[in-house]
Amino acid sequence: MSARQEQKAEAFRALHEGAPFVIPNPWDAGSARMLEALGFQALATTSSGFAFTLGKLDGKVTLDEVAAHVAALDAATELPVSVDLEHGYDASADRAAAAIRRVAAAGAVGGSIEDWDPVEQRIYDFDHAVERVAAAATVAGELGFPFTFTARAENHIRGRDDLDDTIARLQAFERAGADVLYAPGLKTVDQIRAVCDAVSKPVNVLTVPSLTLAEMAEAGAQRVSVGGALTWVAVKAAADAASAIRAGDFSALDARVPAGDWLREDEGRG
């Protein structure tokens, strides 16, 4: 751990104690620099967006690849970086928890573990899910700096719209030591409020396009992330332009961005 990483960790932890905030999800170092220049205070990786940059589907990236990605983002920006660790790249509680240590060594100051088993294509049993969170929380607490550990309950993005089970899992994850709780796929203000009212730790909400930050914050959300959405906005723009080019129309290429401002070379960066 460096003084720089400790400062990032403390800044990230403090964000969870202040006003609700948006944490956008860059897909590479350039997009991280852009988001920093636009004034965001912290960044989170996107598993699906990063996988796309490697020509892979979500869930097919290795821990080695994620650690290298984290190191690149950390070197590119002075913002805190939190990592989507999916299921921890192993069903075992201890080995999944070890992913926390691995990305912390690469520069991360936060990270999440979810309760979805990509091998069996199912939600982990309740007790095993809690065991995995407890193991990850233990590792996070041993790092020597305030690593912000997020525990995810995946029901609502995996076709299992059981709010009672989601709340029970998040409450158990809180008791197991998670710093932040997250149930991606909540769709309404009432669902967000029910989750936030049921726990005492900060809650991350995956953005709902039909809701504003103010509405989600009023329901209790402390942190709002966008997942892979920014990646897909960029990819769609590129695909639409490429389709026009293929048809002989080059007007879509008339785009200007302040890349020089976004990618300025600051002394001491990284």
Predicted region positions:
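Extended, intrinsically disordered, low-complexity segments
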Residues: 2-3, 12, 228-270
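Alpha/beta enzyme core
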Residues: 2-83, 88-226, 232-240
